[in-house]
């Protein structure tokens, strides 16, 4: 988890990042499972659409560690306003589909300091478009791609950020499949490329 202080300037309508940053690692927790494998995405989608999300025991334990880590980060902050962004598909209560980690359907209820969970890809694009150090401040039409464990992606058209939650015929990289059945994200993200290299090199 990366913590970053920032100020919103009402006059310029820009986000001004502070120099303070701190990172918290799930892997620092003694019970974190590095080899955790989430349920297949299609199974997760079916469970969500049918209104019956069935978490595995390991998924619950991983999710508890995520909540503990977020809670710790918030408790160490000296801020009156907190925003949280996270990967995965969300409903009003939590994370219901997750490609690279545990689903936490009751996330928001367990973190009292927040009233919404924002999409991490959307926040990456918002930061680049509306931060004083953003590289897309004057962009009218562009595609944003950022790499890490997965891929953060976004589209700007006519100066407006496309909302993937509203425009359903546009897919994110982890939803797009190659001819081999792999996701674009698993092929192009830094973590995915490393995993693929290790697998092919034996």
Question: What is the meaning of each model-derived region?
Answer:
Residues 2-47, 51-52, 117-118, 131-202:
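Glycine/GP-enriched mid-protein hinge/lid loop-to-helix segment characteristic of carbohydrate kinases
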Residues 27-71, 75-141:
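Glycine-rich phosphate-binding loop and adjoining helix at the ATP-binding site
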């Amino acid at each position: 988890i990366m913590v970053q202080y920032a100020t919103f300037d009402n006059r310029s309508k820009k986000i001004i990042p502070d120099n303070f940053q701190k990172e918290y690692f799930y892997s620092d927790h003694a019970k974190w499972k590095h080899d955790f494998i989430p349920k297949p995405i299609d199974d997760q989608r079916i469970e969500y659409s049918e209104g019956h999300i069935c978490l595995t025991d390991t998924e619950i334990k991983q999710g508890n560690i995520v909540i503990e880590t977020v809670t710790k980060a918030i408790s160490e902050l000296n801020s009156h306003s907190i925003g949280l962004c996270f990967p995965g598909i969300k409903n009003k209560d939590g994370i219901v589909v997750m490609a690279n980690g545990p689903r936490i359907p009751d996330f928001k209820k367990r973190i009292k300091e927040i009233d919404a969970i924002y999409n991490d890809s959307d926040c990456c694009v918002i930061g680049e478009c509306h931060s004083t150090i953003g590289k897309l401040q004057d962009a009218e039409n562009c595609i944003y791609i950022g790499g890490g464990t997965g891929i953060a992606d976004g589209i700007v058209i006519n100066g407006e950020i496309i909302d993937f939650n509203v425009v359903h015929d546009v897919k994110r990289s982890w939803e797009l499949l190659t001819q081999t059945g792999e996701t674009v994200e698993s092929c192009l993200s830094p973590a995915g490329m490393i995993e693929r290299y290790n697998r092919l090199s034996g």
